[in-house]
């Protein structure tokens, strides 16, 4: 036969429309052989080529077939045509047999195997109409239906292990044939040919009777018999294998089921055997089968369900699902759910039928039922267990749950039941719900655990997991922390380097900017607005404090390298190096700087070189944390408290590098000075960034950084503990305030130029200054400083007076004045000790000596202050207000309160400067060097001491503060008095005013405004409060009133004090009615009595001071008595003061009457206003710390 006609062609017929096969005469019916024989005979000799019966199936035959004819194994599936389909079963060599998937090449098609044991079967499908019958499955005859369905849709699937389908193929077929009725041709055809689209469809379309249980050409009986017992009958039976074969591999048939639209499984025709079980049609009446089977059993046009049912065979031997094509098993069901008992026909019960053809695993009908029951039970158990697990998943109690439903409770005991029966079924067998399939049973989980859920891509993950990490924020935070630690932590001499390297990009530029005096620039540039905000706030606060409590003029010369940081040591180094002259200037400034608060230091650091600001720049710019700024402040203070030795070490270690660094910084400072001025001014409106100031900033910065390097946390703690360092910082802020002053700025500019030149020449000096080597810088610088300071003092007296007012406000000023005295003394010592910060101790000792000298006086002053404190405050409230009103009238809107301190100190300093310039530069130098040295010392120690003095002076009477200042003040006052005596006639009023102012300012400054807090403290505090804003005007007016430059200076001072002492001047007039000579003597005596003249400025002046001091005690008592005069005089004074205020220093000197009234008022106020101390005979008050009496000064 041609290859086309062989199984290959047959297989192609499955996929392609059948070629009209050559019609072969039907061979004689094959001897009846059992399916087993057929199955076995497949391996037998092929010696009988004709052994394979050729089944011609025609519609006529199918119609004629009766139940007896059913034995005829001619099966035509959908072969409605009369065309003969002859299945030629040839026995060519086994090797030549075409291989059909699922079909043994050597074996005869199931059911086609004959008794001859045809090993090779060539099936020729003869279809005249192209209707295909499976030759291997049996002649599928003619079927017109075949044509319509089989050409495209017919797929013959042969299962090589068709033995299950074939089981008892011929016999079953014969049975089927016997049972099938001829009533309907469609119904009688047991052969089911699987169609591509719907395996059930072809059969639905096909009339079973038509496709007919056709016997092999021969009697239906023969066919039936052959179907039962003969292989040929079995061979004719195979067409039914098409039915059963669809989707039923003998190995998989029980596990896989024909689903609607499912493609037939190759070789799945296990029922290829002629009457093989696969040929069994689903019974017509098998609707949904009874039992668990929920499958849709379709009659498929079966008219004789009984016949079909009789012939029905389940190849897998279990439930009716065996019908395969007829039975549509829902995808959610399994064969195990089909109840085989519902089948009317049970072919496996036929004698000679191989049970293995129907049941696998050695099961039989009963065992299968048992197995199904076990599966049911197991499914129930697993289902209940799973439910129980779900139910108990949230329960921690593993014990019996009374709320557990009985079913679940019963199933709970079955949890431990082994799933042994599941082993009976291949895992493949599980097609149904996992809950029902034991193989799908999940291992039980201990109760109480959450239900295991397999993660899927679609599941929602926690946002924390899905959220992209924000590394920037983390980095920024970490960076801030690191920066804080780096900046705040000292690392010996490397601290600066580390600080620089901590944020190499930021820190270094900041350092450089600092050193270059660009630091303000860099700082302002680097400072974020938030950074500038704190600085500006600090600066504003500092400015307020400075205006209140610090002398604007005193703004510590930290504008020079000394005072930038306000560090005691750095300022001492620079001021010491600067020399006495520099000290003189700086001393006045430092006195002005009388440290208000550590915040001032912070601001000084901000305005000057505030490392705080620097750290805030670095740390804030880098980390943006204000905490760093605060830490920097502390560190700065600590660093300031570090001794010059450390600084020198730092300089020595870092000198070369620092020199280079300073050079670079100097250049960079110059480049960025303008920007730094802008930024610094932005950050610190008071600060115009004198180059000197910038230099000092840079120097201090370097110095601080070196300190950071060299200074350990302990040193910093010492610095923190050291009030002077904080004072120095505040003084630095004062210095910034001074920088706001034009004179100070000019001086700062001069210094800046000098500093620039020095920076260019000795860039390391900045570091040296910072490292305690400021002495190198200081000598020349202080000379210029002194000059600038002198000019500045002249200009800044009003500011000093303003600041002195703030000093007056605090009784703690007494302490500050003491400190100021000590500071002046220390300054005197400091210009000697400039090179060594450690000499501060000696300065302190000397200050202690001075304090011992002044101790008694201060004790007296304290006693007096305590006694007069309330009266003094009252007097201040009354007369001071009047004076303030007058002074306000004179001075306008100037800051009176802040300038009071400055006025006292500034006026003292100004008078000291002027008198010194005019009369005794030596005395002035004594005063200034003392002041400078003490200001340097204060810058390191006394700055904070002065600041404390200011605060304490504000808290305490001024009398105590006058102690130390009175000495120098008296010295300068003596020289001034000499000049005043010379100019008595011409400048009598001016001198009186000026001297009063000098005495007040100097005493207030030296005494920390504590002595001034005496009699003057009350009146002057009031007047000065009002006068503080007027001081500049007063100075100007003094200039106008001054007949000469000296007189102008005196008049400036005097005017500033005149403004303060408008009422005092009136009193002075009254006192002048007395002998001016007597008043002058009294002044000298009172000055001597004030005890501040521990050192007579001049021999004659010293003597006069001694006499005056001796008289002061008496005068004090007299003044006290006089001060008890009725307040009416005070009011008179106030009225006159107001008038004079309107005159703005054009006030005529008060008449003797007025002065007398004023004296009375003041004398009356004195007991009440302890501050009102010695008053000139003219009414000018000389604040005596101890006696707080008014010394009337009268110039003949």
Swiss-Prot record:
Regions of biased composition (Polar residues) lie at 117-126, 549-561, 643-657, 998-1021
Asked if the Swiss-Prot or TrEMBL record annotates the protein with the keyword Transferase, the reply is: no
| Composition skew (Acidic residues), residue ranges | 142-154, 179-190
Question: Low complexity: which segments have biased composition?
Answer: 268-278
Q: Where do we find the motif Nuclear localization signal 2 here?
A: 734-741
A Gene Ontology annotation in the biological process aspect, one of them, is: mRNA processing
- One Pfam family this chain carries? Fip1
Q: Which UniProt keywords apply?
A: mRNA processing, Nucleus, Repeat, RNA-binding
Tissue-specific expression: Expressed in leaves, stems, flower tissues and roots.
Motif residue range(s): Nuclear localization signal 1: 704-711
User: In what ranges is there compositional bias, type Gly residues?
Assistant: 129-141, 226-236
Instruction: Check the record and name the InterPro entries matching this protein.
Output: Fip1_dom, FIPS5/FIPS3-like
The segment annotated Disordered runs over 1-102, 117-248, 268-300, 413-472, 485-1174
Principal subcellular localisation of the protein: nucleus
Gene Ontology molecular functions: identical protein binding; RNA binding
Please state what is observed when this gene is inactivated.
Lethal.
Q: Where in the cell is it found?
A: Nucleus
List the biased-composition ranges (Basic and acidic residues).
Answer: 518-548, 565-592, 608-641, 661-673, 699-802, 810-918, 925-945, 953-971, 1046-1071, 1103-1137, 1151-1163
What's one GO-annotated cellular component?
A: nucleus
* Annotated Pro residues bias: 18-31
Q: How does it assemble?
A: Component of the cleavage and polyadenylation specificity factor (CPSF) complex. Forms a complex with cleavage and polyadenylation specificity factor (CPSF) subunits CFIS1, CFIS2, CPSF30, CSTF50, CSTF64, CSTF77, FIPS3, PABN1, PABN2, PABN3, PAPS4, CFIM25 and PABN1. Binds RNA.
Say which family it is in. Belongs to the FIP1 family.
**The protein's role, per its UniProt record:** Essential gene. Component of the cleavage and polyadenylation specificity factor (CPSF) complex that plays a key role in pre-mRNA 3'-end formation, recognizing the AAUAAA signal sequence and interacting with poly(A) polymerase and other factors to bring about cleavage and poly(A) addition. FIP1L1 contributes to poly(A) site recognition and stimulates poly(A) addition. Binds to U-rich RNA sequence elements surrounding the poly(A) site. May act to tether poly(A) polymerase to the CPSF complex.
Q: What is this protein called?
A: FIP1[V]-like protein
* Species for this entry: Arabidopsis thaliana (Mouse-ear cress)
Starting at the broadest rank, the lineage of the source organism is: Eukaryota, Viridiplantae, Streptophyta, Embryophyta, Tracheophyta
**Which gene is the coding source of this polypeptide chain?**
FIPS5
């Amino acid at each position: 036969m041609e290859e086309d006609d062989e199984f290959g062609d047959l297989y192609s017929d499955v996929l392609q429309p059948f070629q009209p096969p050559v019609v072969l005469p039907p061979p004689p019916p094959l001897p009846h052989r059992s399916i087993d024989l057929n199955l076995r005979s497949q391996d037998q000799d092929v010696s009988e080529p004709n052994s394979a019966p050729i089944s011609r199936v025609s519609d006529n035959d199918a119609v004629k077939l009766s139940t007896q004819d059913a034995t005829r194994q001619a099966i035509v599936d959908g072969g409605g045509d009369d065309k003969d389909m002859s299945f030629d079963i040839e026995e060519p060599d086994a090797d030549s047999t075409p291989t059909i998937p699922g079909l043994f090449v050597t074996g005869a098609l199931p059911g086609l195997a004959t008794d001859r044991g045809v090993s090779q079967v060539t099936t020729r499908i003869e279809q005249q109409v192209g209707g295909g019958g499976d030759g291997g499955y049996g002649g599928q005859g003619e079927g017109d239906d075949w044509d319509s369905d089989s050409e495209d849709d017919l797929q013959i699937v042969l299962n090589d292990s068709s033995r299950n389908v074939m089981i008892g193929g011929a016999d079953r077929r014969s049975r089927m044939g016997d049972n099938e009725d001829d009533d309907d041709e469609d119904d009688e055809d047991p052969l089911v040919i699987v169609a591509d689209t719907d395996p059930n469809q072809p059969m639905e379309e096909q009339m079973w009777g038509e496709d007919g249980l056709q016997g092999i050409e021969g009697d239906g009986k023969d066919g039936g018999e052959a179907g039962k017992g003969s292989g040929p009958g079995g061979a004719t039976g195979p067409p039914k294998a098409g039915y059963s074969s669809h989707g039923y591999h003998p190995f998989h048939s029980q596990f896989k089921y024909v689903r609607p639209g499912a493609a037939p499984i190759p070789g799945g025709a296990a029922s290829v055997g002629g009457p093989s079980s696969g040929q069994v049609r689903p019974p017509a009446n098998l609707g949904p089968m009874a039992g668990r089977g929920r499958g849709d059993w379709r009659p498929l046009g079966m008219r004789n369900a009984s016949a079909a049912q009789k012939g029905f065979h389940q190849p897998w031997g279990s439930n009716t699902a065996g019908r395969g094509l007829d039975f549509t098993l829902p995808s959610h069901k399994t064969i195990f759910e089909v109840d085989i008992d519902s089948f009317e026909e049970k072919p496996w019960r036929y004698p000679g039928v191989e049970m293995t053809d129907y049941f696998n695993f050695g099961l039989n009908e009963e065992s299968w039922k048992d197995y199904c029951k076990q599966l049911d039970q197991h499914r129930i158990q697993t289902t209940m267990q799973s439910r129980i697990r779900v139910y108990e998943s949230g329960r921690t109690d593993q014990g019996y749950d009374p709320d557990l439903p009985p079913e679940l409770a019963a199933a709970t005991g079955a949890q431990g039941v082994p799933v042994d029966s599941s082993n009976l079924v291949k895992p493949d067998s599980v097609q149904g719900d996992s809950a029902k399939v034991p193989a799908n049973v999940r291992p039980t989980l201990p109760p109480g655990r959450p239900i295991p859920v397999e993660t899927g891509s679609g599941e929602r993950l926690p946002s924390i997991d899905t959220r992209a990490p924000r590394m920037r924020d983390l980095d920024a935070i970490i960076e801030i922390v690191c920066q804080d630690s780096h900046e705040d932590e000292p690392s010996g001499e490397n601290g600066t380097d580390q600080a620089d390297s901590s944020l190499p990009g930021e820190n270094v530029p900041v350092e450089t900017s600092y050193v270059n005096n660009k630091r303000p620039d860099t700082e302002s540039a680097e400072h974020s607005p938030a950074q500038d905000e704190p600085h500006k706030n600090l600066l504003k606060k500092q400015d307020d404090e400075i205006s209140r409590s610090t002398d604007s003029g005193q703004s510590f010369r930290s504008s020079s390298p000394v005072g930038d940081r306000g560090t005691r040591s750095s300022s001492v180094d620079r001021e010491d190096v600067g020399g006495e002259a520099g000290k003189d200037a700086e001393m006045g400034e430092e006195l002005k700087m009388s440290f208000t608060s550590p915040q001032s230091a912070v601001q000084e650091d901000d305005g000057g070189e505030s490392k705080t600001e620097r750290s805030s720049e670095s740390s804030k710019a880098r980390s943006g944390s204000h905490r760093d700024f605060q830490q920097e402040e502390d560190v700065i203070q600590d660093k300031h408290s570090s001794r010059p030795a450390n600084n020198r070490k730092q300089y020595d270690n870092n000198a070369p590098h620092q020199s280079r660094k300073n050079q670079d910084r100097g250049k960079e400072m110059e480049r960025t000075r303008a920007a730094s001025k802008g930024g610094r001014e932005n950050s610190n409106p008071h600060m115009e960034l004198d180059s000197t100031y910038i230099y000092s900033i840079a120097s201090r910065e370097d110095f601080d950084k070196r300190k950071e390097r060299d200074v350990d946390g302990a040193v910093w703690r010492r610095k923190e503990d050291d009030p002077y360092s904080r004072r120095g910082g505040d003084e630095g802020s004062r210095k910034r305030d001074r920088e706001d002053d034009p004179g100070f700025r000019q001086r700062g500019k001069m210094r800046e130029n000098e500093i620039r030149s020095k920076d260019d020449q000795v860039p390391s000096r900045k570091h040296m200054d910072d490292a305690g080597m400021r002495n190198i810088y200081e000598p020349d610088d202080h000379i210029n400083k002194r000059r600038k300071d002198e000019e500045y003092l002249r200009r800044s007296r009003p500011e000093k007076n303003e600041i002195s007012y703030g000093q007056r406000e605090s009784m703690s000023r007494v302490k500050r004045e003491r400190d100021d005295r000590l500071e002046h003394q220390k300054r005197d010592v400091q210009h000697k000790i400039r090179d060594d910060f450690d000499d501060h101790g000696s300065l302190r000792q000397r200050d202690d000596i001075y304090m011992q000298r002044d101790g008694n006086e201060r004790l007296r002053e304290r006693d007096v202050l305590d006694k007069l404190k309330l009266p003094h405050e009252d007097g201040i409230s009354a007369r001071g207000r009047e004076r303030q009103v007058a002074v306000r009238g004179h001075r306008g809107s100037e800051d009176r309160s802040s300038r009071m301190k400055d006025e006292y100190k500034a006026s003292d300093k100004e008078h000291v400067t002027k008198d010194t310039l005019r009369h005794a530069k030596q005395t002035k130098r004594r005063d200034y060097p003392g002041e400078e040295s003490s200001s340097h010392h204060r810058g390191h120690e006394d700055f904070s001491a002065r600041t404390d003095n200011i605060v304490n002076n504000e808290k305490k009477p001024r009398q105590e503060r006058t102690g130390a200042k009175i000495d120098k003040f008296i010295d300068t006052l003596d020289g001034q008095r000499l000049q005043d005596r010379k100019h008595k006639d011409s400048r009598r009023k001016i001198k009186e005013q000026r001297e009063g102012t000098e005495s007040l300012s100097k005493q207030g400054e030296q005494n920390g405004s504590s002595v001034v807090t005496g009699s003057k403290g009350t009146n002057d505090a009031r007047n000065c409060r009002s006068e503080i804003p007027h001081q500049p005007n007063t100075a100007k007016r003094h200039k106008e009133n001054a007949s000469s430059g000296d007189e102008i200076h005196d008049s400036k001072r005097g005017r500033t004090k005149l403004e303060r002492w408008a009422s005092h001047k009136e009193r002075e007039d009254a006192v002048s009615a007395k002998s001016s000579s007597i008043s002058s003597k009294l002044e000298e005596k009172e000055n001597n009595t004030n005890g501040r003249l521990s050192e007579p400025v001049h021999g004659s002046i010293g003597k006069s001071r001694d006499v005056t001091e001796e008289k002061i005690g008496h005068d004090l008592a007299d003044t006290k008595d006089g001060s008890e005069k009725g307040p009416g005089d005070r009011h008179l004074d106030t009225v006159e003061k107001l008038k004079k205020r309107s005159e703005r220093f054009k006030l005529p000197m008060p008449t003797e009457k007025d002065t007398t009234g004023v004296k009375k008022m003041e004398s009356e106020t004195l007991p009440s206003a302890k501050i009102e101390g010695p008053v000139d005979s003219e009414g000018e008050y000389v604040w005596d710390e101890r006696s707080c009496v008014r010394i009337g000064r009268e110039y003949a």
